[in-house]
Amino acid sequence: MPMLSEGRFLSTRARSNRIVWFVLLFQVATSIVSQAATNRIRTAHSIGWYNTFLTFRLSDKSSIQAEYQWRREGWISNWQQSLLRIGYHVQLHPRVTARLGYGWIETFPYGDIPLNGFGKQFTEHRLFQAIVLQDEVKRLSISQRWMLEERWLGRYASAASTKEEDFDLLGRIRYQVRLQHPISKPGDGQGHFYIATYDELFIGFGKNVKENVFDQNRLAGLIGFQSRSSFRVEAGFLQQLLQLGREVNGKNVFQYNNGVTVNLYYMLDLRKRN
């Protein structure tokens, strides 16, 4: 694969910034249209997502990341979702990283209208491919991620079924933009604090996608601490707008989930040193 030159990469910065603003405006417009719709059922939940990310650096340009996300409803009381994911990352350019991997997800029934029509827990097996673009404007870090997912969701034949009889294949595209800015100067090996925000839009596609072509949108505001280069922790608010893939009484169902998220990152350097 031909490498991007630094000059050519930087020449796309203005266009990249326009794309960021266009997508943000699109997401805001989507949210406004969603709020204005009348043929809908609204539900709301308090959520807490508690996540751990471990990165094993294999070389200067490659790494493996394993993550577990403990997603709860009622802040911490009830299961919402369990997500285990592992991926391989390769750096194509100092500012461009490619990722691919696998995820195992368990989604649980919660709230008055569960995601599964029979009110059952279901399994999802997921493959993903992603491109991450990093940029900086002075001290502001800008990260954009485009992700493609192939999702196999467990399906029950009836309410009496005790296990999933089949798995339906669904496609999904995700776009995330994240902004991060330090709020303290790095000390001598002491690390620094920062603030960050991100927004991520999910769009479903494929013959098995029903009502939720607009799948969900996530918005977060965070404060974090970066210790040197190996450890990072951040926490803040999380808003999830999610559309169910089915109608209830002829109406679309939207979840308005608000809560907290806590993310812990740690990197292990496995590169061989002379």
Describe the role of every protein-language-model region:
Residues S46-G48, Q80-S82, T123-L127, F167-Y175, ...:
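Residues that define the transmembrane beta-barrel architecture of outer-membrane proteins
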Residues T52, R85-I86, Q129-I131, Y175-V177, ...:
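Membrane-embedded beta-strands of outer-membrane beta-barrel proteins
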Residues F56, V90, Y102, L133-D135, ...:
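Residue-level signature of outer-membrane beta-barrel architecture
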Residues D60-K61, R95, E136-S143, I183-F193, ...:
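Short loop/turn motifs that connect adjacent beta-strands in outer-membrane beta-barrel proteins
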Residues I64-A66, A98-L100, L140-W146, I173, ...:
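Transmembrane beta-strands of outer-membrane beta-barrel proteins
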Residues Y68-G74, Y102-F108, D135-V137, L148-W152, ...:
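Transmembrane beta-strands of outer-membrane beta-barrel pores
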Residues I131, Y256-N274:
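Outer-membrane beta-barrel "beta-signal"
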Residues M147-L244:
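Outer-membrane beta-barrel transmembrane domain signature
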